Amino acid sequence: MSEVALTPLDEPALARLLDAAVAGADPLEVMPPVGGPPGWTPERRAAFLEFHRARCLNSATAVERTWVVDVDGEAVGAARLQPDGDAVEAGIWLSRSSRGRGIGARVTALLLAEARSSGAARLLASTTAGNRGARALLEGAGATLIVEGDEVAVELPLS
């Protein structure tokens, strides 16, 4: 069985995360939209780095903790927790080649442990109705899913 680990994001890990995103994800799956032609343009790569620096690495602007998802030492995605009152909002993305292999369930368990150790009372997440993989992971963890049209809101008590 492959070793799955969460590595705290720092500059070297961010470079590995960008490589994983470029190799195995569409930019719209892993970052806010950036104008221009589709694909991983130089501008989109720079925006990816700045997005993560601002949200996690810059102490003046950080709003979340982010980890690189490593499988056998190779970056394959990211996981994050953002404080939201007595809760933490969670997010995970995995490269296409890492989906459907049980990695998401193991990352979810690791992220839940991090959320519990943070002292949060609840874990929140959101996804789309069509994201069957995310929905299955969250339901498997015991979360309540509230579906409204194409939006799915998730809440899971942590105690």
Model features per residue range: what roles?
Residues M1-E89, S95-R96, E114, I146-L158:
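GNAT-family acyltransferases
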Residues L94, G100-S117, R132-G140:
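Conserved acetyl-CoA-binding loop-helix of GNAT-fold acetyltransferases
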Residues L94, T127, A143:
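Hydrophobic adenine-recognition pocket in adenosine-nucleotide-binding enzymes
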Residues L110, T127, D150-E151:
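Proline- and acidic/polar-enriched loop/turn elements at helix boundaries
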Residues A115-T127:
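Conserved GNAT acetyl-CoA-binding A-motif
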